[in-house]
Amino acid sequence: MMMHSSACDCEASLCETLRGFSAKHPDSVIYQTSLMSALLSGVYEGDTTIADLLAHGDFGLGTFNELDGEMIAFSSQVYQLRADGSARAAKPEQKTPFAVMTWFQPQYRKTFDAPVSRQQIHDVIDQQIPSDNLFCALRIDGNFRHAHTRTVPRQTPPYRAMTDVLDDQPVFRFNQREGVLVGFRTPQHMQGINVAGYHEHFITDDRQGGGHLLDYQLESGVLTFGEIHKLMIDLPADSAFLQANLHPSNLDAAIRSVEN
């Protein structure tokens, strides 16, 4: 009996240790709410809150209900990048129709002491993680020679398709600014579910401005990144999503036009 009790105590202790380790070191999983193709077709309202997102990760990007600006999240802080170029901390009760989150656990680090282009940074990542069949999360902290961004203006019903909305997109250029870049590289076979290729958002170091990145050049800074093998998607059940055309014939071209 004594030996059995001791074995049980050891097993319970081991289980508790493993639970504690898992809590501190969660799996690298991409959590996503809704689909990019739904956003593209005008599904701009969701029930997922910022608080919900932070239960699934400390790092990510997306947008807000009514397409009211871009979202950037890092170090468990979430910001709303608005159509006037300003930024503000998001409220826990705000909701999103589309967002992507993960627990950021980079496996690689690269320091840049001389100017590099967006493409050169992507080349570094692609050389380290050559398979296009894996997800990748990336972050840059540094001085940006320039960051060319856009944001999306808030919409009201009846909602237009995103390709029409972005005819009116405001664009901004941040020159010689310290800031943070948050991004994902998504496999090409995921186009429509997510945004294939690189998708990156930017916020200034004073947390006062930023947006969806169209282009940038890094003066100096630190790139951290890592691969991700798991994906979890929460699909909406509302009528707007259920009736949306999620696979139009021009899906790939439409996503590339709104993202680039």
Swiss-Prot record:
* Pathway field: Polyol metabolism; (R,R)-butane-2,3-diol biosynthesis; (R,R)-butane-2,3-diol from pyruvate: step 2/3
Protein name in UniProt: Alpha-acetolactate decarboxylase
Could you list this entry's UniProt keywords, alphabetically sorted. Acetoin biosynthesis, Decarboxylase, Lyase
Family affiliation: Belongs to the alpha-acetolactate decarboxylase family.
Checking InterPro entries in the record gives: Acetolactate_a_deCO2ase
E.C. code: 4.1.1.5
Kindly list the GO molecular function terms attached to this UniProt entry.
acetolactate decarboxylase activity
What is this enzyme's catalytic activity, as reactions?
(2S)-2-acetolactate + H(+) = (R)-acetoin + CO2
The processes (GO biological process) annotated in the record are: acetoin biosynthetic process
Q: What does this protein do?
A: Converts acetolactate into acetoin, which can be excreted by the cells. This may be a mechanism for controlling the internal pH of cells in the stationary stage.
